[in-house]
Regions:
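Histidine/lysine/aspartate-rich catalytic loop segments that bind and position anionic ligands
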Residues: 112-115, 121-122
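Conserved small/polar residues in nucleotide/adenosyl-binding loops
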Residues: 169-170
Length: 172
């Protein structure tokens, strides 16, 4: 599908932040079964979804409110860009690119989904400025932490990673 409409996030999931933090850990073993659409919806909303519809502000703060972090969702059938405004996935490329984003880490290839966080530094203006790059890295780190906390609470396996095959950056 070129567009996958996600169900509304379940804002009444059980669990506490403190419990999620106490149980948060990285894992490198993943179930091969697909993540159900409800869990994927909740995960993406928790990562960087809109939690204040009147202002369009997100679950993850961003430097200067530039909302620079885009979340790409890599599934066996294709790669998608998460559209937080419409809470949907927009197809970027058909096919299985999980190996491309594995960055040489074989354990990632079989994960049912990979999330790729990209800070679009052009939203800040000067992309070569070291401070701009630091803000983008910080913003991506905040989204990554949201993902880790949600996965801990939802009992989903996750591991933050910082590598992928550079030759596939054209997918953007």
């Amino acid at each position: 599908d070129k567009v996958i409409k996600l169900p509304k996030p379940n804002l009444n999931r059980t669990g506490t932040v403190m419990k999620a933090l106490s149980e948060r850990h990285s894992t490198r073993e993943f179930a091969s079964k697909a993540l159900n659409l409800s869990d994927l919806s909740d995960l993406l909303w928790a990562a960087n979804g809109i939690n204040r519809s009147d202002s369009g502000k997100r679950t993850a703060p961003s430097a200067l409110n530039k909302q620079d972090v885009d979340v790409y969702v890599v599934l066996p059938e294709g790669s998608y860009l998460y559209d937080a405004k419409n809470h949907q996935l927009n197809l970027i490329a058909e096919g299985d690119y999980r190996g491309a984003v594995a960055g040489g880490q074989a354990f990632v290839i079989s994960a049912p989904v990979s999330l790729v966080l990209v800070s679009d530094l052009s939203r800040f203006g000067d992309t070569k400025n070291a401070h701009t790059q630091l803000m983008g890295a910080m913003d991506a780190g905040i989204v990554s932490q949201n993902i880790s906390i949600f996965c801990s609470a939802a009992r989903l396996a996750t591991v933050p990673r910082a590598s992928m095959a550079v030759s596939y950056t054209h997918l953007r």
